């Protein structure tokens, strides 16, 4: 079963890469730029065919996670192919810019279309109801432990107030807010818990945690959650999807900013192995909806990262094209090629680092 989820994760990555490369491919075909090769996957070659009409070689490889769309002379250093009419650099700047940008754009389109499908299928969340508090663990020496609360207990009432069906109006974590507002000298909190089908009253006196600077009882808990949904129209699904994708993109940019400026999140950042592990675990534990949500998030991520002006990525190539368009003269091709090569080497080194760390993480 685990193999199934791993293959599903590889398929997800393959779909995103294929859509990205298809963006480059169809933009090139639309603008008349010859495509040298178009491939999906990596590993042993399963299928290969060269078009007699266009000269494009189409390749399908075993592992569906990766791909490419190559052009004549795109990273040429010696300039030998500059007179070749198929050379990418001989095409108009706007044609090359459109071809470069359509890869990331198609990732955004994929994320948006999937999001619309999700909202049309499951509806719009119009309300959230919170329920009973399930105790997962109890800290040794904490107030809850001394009061007799045990893992597996379910908090039904706090000071005789029912925890079930609380609306999302600021009271959804009423049990926890009562703990936060507790002050020394107050009466202990009366918690009615369900234990093995029976109701038991326990009296808990929260304590100030110096590290957190808040009142705590020493429990790890899970709160029941029910989302109230309504069917939404196509127009509403489009609105929700646009907002969802923009919000997701904003969170990704904030995370990238923190990673670059302060190193925040470096330990949580991973490469392909970590991504596959995350997709596998989420799909296995939470189902197909989680799979689609990850597809949306990773697709937006792929589109945004590729637009960054990092040598070797689409964003960097777009910058060189903008310079050429503004000054009517390209940066020397060999200079641009070496800059992209340096970018590839750095990115490859980063990829190796994260892959190595992810593999170590798997076997800990």
Which residue ranges define each predicted feature?
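Interfacial loop-to-transmembrane junctions
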Residues: 328-345
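Alpha-helical transmembrane segments of integral membrane proteins
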Residues: 5-12, 293, 297, 343-350
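Small-residue-rich helix-interface/hinge motifs
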Residues: 4-82, 305-327
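Residue-level signature of transmembrane alpha-helical entry/exit and packing/kink sites
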Residues: 1, 5-9, 91-96, 100, ...
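Juxtamembrane boundary at the C-terminal end of a transmembrane helix
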Residues: 353-364
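Transmembrane alpha-helix interface/packing and boundary motifs in multi-pass membrane proteins
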Residues: 258-262, 298-313
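Alpha-helical transmembrane segments of multi-pass membrane proteins
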Residues: 13-17, 70, 107, 111, ...
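PDZ peptide-recognition modules
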Residues: 79-94, 106-265, 269, 273-276
